[in-house]
Amino acid sequence: MYKTALFYDDHQEKRKKIILVILLLLLLFGIYKNGLQYLSNNLVLKTDIFKLFLYPIISFIGVLGYSLLKKEKITIDNACEAIILALLVPPRFPLIIYSIIIFGYFLLKSFNYKCIEAISLIVIYKVILILVGSIIHLNNLNLVELNHSYHYGILNNFFGYSVGDLGTTNIVLIIILLITMCSSFYYKKELVFYLLLPFFIWQVINVLLLKELNTTLLQSTYFFASILIAPLNGKSPGSKKEIIIFGLGISLL
């Protein structure tokens, strides 16, 4: 069974619960940011908001089906996985295609291929979402952002009011998540540092030369992926040299 490195330690149940709560907050904020906040102004329909709730419901159904197939109990690990899958989906992604991708995700997971585990199944999942989005010409704008022009400032970006996936825009919550996970022995903190280092360097250059922060970088799902995918994958680089090469290489790409 595929597990992330963070969840290998059975003595970290309390930390798992904290992480689960933060992931839930990211999800709830994403639903608010992409739908609920516009309801009072009649900019979205209730059916549009209901659709946002269907993403985590579909991913939890996938977890349930996988657990029944493997005859395993549903754990906090499974709940976290289901929420992460929902957080990474663009807010207007077609539900039918999303359901097919979730089915494929857990089908691949059931085979337990070592090559897939080494790459990280969640990485494959996100790449497929990006590829499908490109094919059907879908971006990360929600329904209101698609029809109105918005300019998001620095504070908007930090507190999540920016363009992004369903639940990956709130940098404040993501930083809290990072601090929580850094207390785990298995969490690869150095890898996160080298994944984010080029971004911080680029921001310093922007401030020194252009006298402003590059808010486009703050809108990226990259922050969320940098702390939750590679650092938690047990098969990702472990040695100092490998971590530096992998972290800087991926971030530059």
Predicted features along the sequence, with ranges:
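Structural signature of hydrophobic alpha-helical transmembrane segments
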Residues: 41-57, 91-100, 157-171, 211-223
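Cytoplasmic-side transmembrane-helix entry/capping segments in multi-pass membrane proteins
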Residues: 72-81, 97-100, 116-127, 189-198, ...
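Long hydrophobic alpha-helical segments that form multi-pass transmembrane helix bundles
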Residues: 113-178
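Central hydrophobic cores of alpha-helical transmembrane segments in multi-pass inner-membrane proteins
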Residues: 51-67, 82-83, 101-110
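Small-residue-rich segments of transmembrane alpha-helices in multi-pass membrane proteins
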Residues: 24, 79-91, 122-137, 197-207, ...
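Transmembrane alpha-helix boundary signature
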Residues: 31-40, 64-73, 90-97, 115-119, ...
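C-terminal transmembrane helix-loop-helix hairpin of multi-pass membrane proteins
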Residues: 8-21, 158-167, 194, 202-253
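N-terminal signal-anchor module of multipass membrane proteins
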Residues: 1-64
